[in-house]
Amino acid sequence: MRAVIQRAKEAKVTVGGEVVGAIDAGFVVLLGITHEDTEDDAAYLAEKIAHLRVFEDEDGKMNRSLLDVGGAVLSVSQFTLYGDCRKGRRPNFMAAAKPDHALPLYEAFNAALRERGVHVETGVFGAMMDVSLTNDGPVTLIIDSSEKPGNR
């Protein structure tokens, strides 16, 4: 499971001209899911994201977490995070999980964040979405659950 995390001052996701999710300060999380991912991967990423200390404290140091600042997450499923661009000019998406495997894990990830006290707004799984945000910093991080200690 792969997450691209962007610290945002505000963000929203629109489907068919209608806003379906919006947050004030927090993270926009673009989440990609691959075939081998499990609920353990979802829980691992949720725990990491909820506690990442990338918000500034009173001294201007990145020392506060999403929970510390009362931030929210705008969670957007994005299979293209598993696009393989090594050959040719058209990405290969064979590493991206099919919807029947990915949707329950996307929902498990969002539920795991909520269990940790994070307010979560979402896009629409599988839909064409317009995501807009005001980057804060910018601060952008990539976390891949396959790189956690003891994994695969």
UniProtKB/Swiss-Prot annotation:
<keyword id="KW-0378">Hydrolase</keyword>
<feature type="short sequence motif" description="Gly-cisPro motif, important for rejection of L-amino acids">
    <location>
        <begin position="137"/>
        <end position="138"/>
    </location>
</feature>
<dbReference type="InterPro" id="IPR023509">
    <property type="entry name" value="DTD-like_sf"/>
</dbReference>
<dbReference type="GO" id="GO:0043908">
    <property type="term" value="F:Ser(Gly)-tRNA(Ala) hydrolase activity"/>
</dbReference>
<comment type="subunit">
    <text>Homodimer.</text>
</comment>
<dbReference type="GO" id="GO:0005737">
    <property type="term" value="C:cytoplasm"/>
</dbReference>
<comment type="function">
    <text>An aminoacyl-tRNA editing enzyme that deacylates mischarged D-aminoacyl-tRNAs. Also deacylates mischarged glycyl-tRNA(Ala), protecting cells against glycine mischarging by AlaRS. Acts via tRNA-based rather than protein-based catalysis; rejects L-amino acids rather than detecting D-amino acids in the active site. By recycling D-aminoacyl-tRNA to D-amino acids and free tRNA molecules, this enzyme counteracts the toxicity associated with the formation of D-aminoacyl-tRNA entities in vivo and helps enforce protein L-homochirality.</text>
</comment>
<dbReference type="InterPro" id="IPR003732">
    <property type="entry name" value="Daa-tRNA_deacyls_DTD"/>
</dbReference>
<comment type="similarity">
    <text>Belongs to the DTD family.</text>
</comment>
<dbReference type="GO" id="GO:0051500">
    <property type="term" value="F:D-tyrosyl-tRNA(Tyr) deacylase activity"/>
</dbReference>
<protein>
    <recommendedName>
        <fullName>D-aminoacyl-tRNA deacylase</fullName>
        <ecNumber>3.1.1.96</ecNumber>
    </recommendedName>
</protein>
<dbReference type="GO" id="GO:0019478">
    <property type="term" value="P:D-amino acid catabolic process"/>
</dbReference>
<dbReference type="Pfam" id="PF02580">
    <property type="entry name" value="Tyr_Deacylase"/>
</dbReference>
<keyword id="KW-0694">RNA-binding</keyword>
<keyword id="KW-0820">tRNA-binding</keyword>
<dbReference type="GO" id="GO:0000049">
    <property type="term" value="F:tRNA binding"/>
</dbReference>
<dbReference type="GO" id="GO:0106026">
    <property type="term" value="F:Gly-tRNA(Ala) deacylase activity"/>
</dbReference>
<keyword id="KW-0963">Cytoplasm</keyword>
